């Protein structure tokens, strides 16, 4: 299972959505939504960037989350995405100070 597939499944389950529900919400035809999402989660198909961006928006995550190699990086991306502009500025300043 690819990193993208793993993160997609985890994010969908956290959102308490079925594969079909998520697929329909991002504009996939209801007749094929479940099957297509299943293929993405199993790594049999790879969604293009446009679809990943739709998935990210629907799940409240940055698109980069799905491509993060490590779990720490993925968690940091999630947390950063949730911050307001001031929080992001402060976190970037702190990161610069640590580096």
Language model segments and positions:
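Short basic helix-loop element that most often maps to the first helix and adjoining turn
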Residues: 6-26
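DNA major-groove recognition helix of helix-turn-helix/homeodomain DNA-binding modules
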Residues: 44, 48-65
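Interfacial/linker helices and their anchor residues that mediate assembly or domain coupling
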Residues: 69-99
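Residue-level signal for the short linker/turn that defines the boundary of a DNA-recognition helix
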Residues: 3-6, 16-17, 32, 47-50
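Recognition helix of helix-turn-helix/homeodomain-like DNA-binding domains
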Residues: 27-46, 68
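Positions in alpha-helical segments
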Residues: 6, 35-38, 74-78
């Amino acid at each position: 299972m690819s990193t993208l597939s793993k993160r997609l499944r985890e994010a969908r389950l956290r959102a308490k959505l079925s594969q079909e529900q998520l697929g329909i919400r991002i504009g996939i035809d209801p007749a094929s939504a479940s099957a297509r999402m299943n293929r993405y989660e199993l790594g049999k198909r790879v969604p293009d960037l446009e679809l990943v961006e739709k998935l990210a928006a629907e799940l409240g995550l940055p698109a980069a989350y799905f491509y993060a190699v490590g779990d720490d990086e993925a968690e940091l991306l999630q947390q950063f995405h949730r911050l307001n502009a001031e929080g992001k500025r402060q976190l970037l300043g702190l990161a610069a100070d640590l580096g």
